[in-house]
Amino acid sequence: MADVVLGVGTGVFIITLIWILTLALTIILSRATGPTKLGIIPVVLLALIITLVLVFFPRAAEVPAPQRAAQIVDMFFIGRYVLLSLVSLVFLAALFMLLPLHFLEPIYAKPLRTH
């Protein structure tokens, strides 16, 4: 049942697409002149046959088989923590390199006004 969208399977979408294309082709062929207009009949019959095959010969069972719960396994667990430790070390190194610049910044005295 992994291919269920909006509660229906892919077959419903295929049938809908087939009939939309059939409708478009019949509209196009109805505007034609002469014997080309008769092309509507095979288009509709082909869509009808495909629809009947999809309805009466489904590939999956009507009741889906019970599925067991999927077990989620983190395969990149060690790599993620190695990456986290490297980023933490770089952050701490940058922090300790910036702290002396912050604390040792000279503060100059303002000159007193003498009258």
Swiss-Prot record:
Compartments where located: Membrane; Cell projection, Cilium
Coiled coil (residue ranges): none
SS bond list: none
InterPro entries on file: Tmem218
Transmembrane segments annotated in the record for this chain: 8-28, 38-58, 81-101
Deletion phenotype: Morpholino knockdown leads to the formation of pronephric cysts and hydrocephalus, features consistent with a ciliopathy.
Any one of the GO CC terms: extracellular region
Bilayer topology term: Multi-pass membrane protein
A Gene Ontology biological process term: regulation of heart looping
Primary localisation category: membrane
Its biological purpose: May be involved in ciliary biogenesis or function.
Family (UniProt): Belongs to the TMEM218 family.
Protein name per UniProt: Transmembrane protein 218
